[in-house]
């Protein structure tokens, strides 16, 4: 299949950079893409930065409409926010896409002992390392984003061996794999994207973990709809507004005294998320910030 590489180059003030990147990513997500490649913003003036987000569009009968929608949404973003967007389009085939995409990801050490290894990279494990082998396909990253890295750190810090773990919006399955390798007895994941469910299952198998039965399960569902049990540790690396929507029902799947780890939150929306979680019976016990991204650890009140 032929693909069209669509890049949105954005320029904004440095304090708005992460928010701008999230807004640009959302354009691609709203068009139905399951994942994008994000390039870190670089300074272009005393207070200005330039970044780029890349998505890959299939060359099919819907391409012209998708391209027009992309241009319209980028223009609308520039009109509503202090962001100037420029679009770039480059044709490529499957092989070009695979090479370009893989060049963005490397072996990464996260937390104390977690190592995320893209399957196309070599790595000799050191004693004590927890190595996660990932091949996320076209749809997902490999833990390099600050929100994923912070979630991994919190799972490593707070997961007790033998406990039950649930990941909401599991994506590549990276948090499920980490939890199982860190000693969780039960590992479940849920995602509303069928591509995510497939890729997560493949990544689990790549790490010697097989979904099926109560010990390890991946479900396609909207948030925690269909989850019929409670867990000791629940993660949700999703957008701020989705966490707020999740909060009304998430207490049902967290045991009393259990923990909820939320990431994907930008600093301007932190107070909104914390207020909602508190109103829904959670105490915020830990906060971590990287760049403008926030990760919260909340305990369900007994």
Swiss-Prot record:
Primary site of residence: cytoplasm
Pfam families xrefs: PrmA
Source species, domain of life: Bacteria
Binding locations of S-adenosyl-L-methionine: 148, 169, 191, 237
Gene3D superfamilies per UniProt: Vaccinia Virus protein VP39
Keywords from the named record: Cytoplasm, Methyltransferase, S-adenosyl-L-methionine, Transferase
InterPro entries linked to this entry: Ribosomal_L11_MeTrfase_PrmA, Ribosomal_PrmA_MeTrfase, SAM-dependent_MTases_sf
EC top class, as a word: transferase
GO molecular function: protein-lysine N-methyltransferase activity
GO biological process assignments: methylation
Compartmental location: Cytoplasm
Reaction(s) catalysed (UniProt annotation): L-lysyl-[protein] + 3 S-adenosyl-L-methionine = N(6),N(6),N(6)-trimethyl-L-lysyl-[protein] + 3 S-adenosyl-L-homocysteine + 3 H(+)
Entry-linked PANTHER family: ELECTRON TRANSFER FLAVOPROTEIN BETA SUBUNIT LYSINE METHYLTRANSFERASE (PTHR43648:SF1)
Family: Belongs to the methyltransferase superfamily. PrmA family.
Protein function: Methylates ribosomal protein L11.
Protein name (record): Ribosomal protein L11 methyltransferase
Organism per entry: Desulfosudis oleivorans (strain DSM 6200 / JCM 39069 / Hxd3) (Desulfococcus oleovorans)
